[in-house]
From Swiss-Prot:
The gene is trpA. Pathway: Amino-acid biosynthesis; L-tryptophan biosynthesis; L-tryptophan from chorismate: step 5/5. It catalyses: (1S,2R)-1-C-(indol-3-yl)glycerol 3-phosphate + L-serine = D-glyceraldehyde 3-phosphate + L-tryptophan + H2O. The active site is at E56 (proton acceptor), D67 (proton acceptor). Tetramer of two alpha and two beta chains. GO terms for molecular function: tryptophan synthase activity. This is Tryptophan synthase alpha chain. It comes from Mycobacterium ulcerans (strain Agy99).
């Protein structure tokens, strides 16, 4: 039996639109402050202009346990440059003004230091749609569940191939907007082959809920984006975009346009 997602979702209309167009959404991640704050904000608006449906605004953190080497290096550079949590909120505001949809992706500690309710308030005021919390599980998220409800934000939790049926069901039930399915075990990073565990993980989520599922951790090409877009509602790209940004904004735009074309290849019926 599947559970229908009844709570209003800020990202719901986007996924409805993508479904009507028979395609997946492109979800792109960049860390705030890399290579500097102003360039990172410009890069995020480039994502919007190049066909990215949702921008994940990363909050650099000093102990990024789930990030691969590309994102870790970018995070270290951003922290060395003095990036702050408020800079991420500025990025969200710029994305919103550019006509895009922004969610913040952060480990929980920076939000805890900022104040959960205050962060939710300021994120909503900046035009943000929600928050991805890779190291926060619903069982320990009472503060965030209350704050996201109070300010109407989506809350995106992670599931993995190792998630037990009970943990997966509980995580999906607590999520709103979409569920982040980690398609490979371990840290993030672009890979030549996308994990074959991803379709099975998406199917497990679909068996218990109609909430959209975004698949991440490994996408780097149009072909991989099209492959995942055949069974997932969202294709999440991080490390490949960070690498492209390291080569400059034109490289970032080119890759984003390529990935956007991939998710727009017609999905199988």
């Amino acid at each position: 039996m599947t559970v229908e997602q009844r709570e209003a979702s800020r990202l719901g209309p986007l996924f409805d639109s993508c479904r009507a167009e028979n395609r997946a959404a492109l979800i792109g991640y960049l860390p705030t402050g890399y290579p500097d704050v102003n360039t990172s904000v410009r890069a995020m608006t480039e994502l919007v202009e190049s066909g990215c449906d949702i921008v994940e605004v990363g909050v650099p953190y000093s102990d990024p346990g789930m990030d691969g080497p590309t994102i870790q290096r970018a995070t270290e550079a951003a922290l060395s440059g003095g990036v702050r949590v408020r800079d991420a909120l500025t990025a969200v505001e710029s994305i919103s003004k550019a006509g895009g949809r922004a969610v913040v992706m952060t480990y929980w500690n920076p939000v805890l230091r900022y104040g959960g309710d205050a962060f939710a308030r300021d994120l909503a005021a900046a035009g943000g749609h929600g928050l991805i919390t890779p190291d926060l599980i619903p069982d320990e998220a009472q503060q965030w569940l209350a704050a996201s409800d109070a300010h109407g934000l989506d809350r995106i939790f992670l599931v993995a191939p190792s998630s037990t049926p009970e943990r997966l069901a509980n995580t999906v039930a607590a999520s709103r907007g979409f569920v982040y399915a980690a398609s490979t075990m371990g840290v993030t990073g672009a890979r030549d082959a996308v994990s074959n565990a991803a379709p099975d993980l998406v199917a497990r989520v679909k068996a218990v809920s109609d909430i959209p599922v975004g698949v991440g951790l490994g996408v780097r090409s149009r072909e991989q984006a099209a492959e995942i877009g055949r069974y997932a509602d969202g294709v999440i790209v991080g490390s490949a975009l960070v690498s492209a940004l390291g080569d400059g904004l034109p490289s970032l735009r080119s890759l984003t346009e390529e990935l956007a074309a991939g998710v727009r290849q017609r999905k199988s019926p």
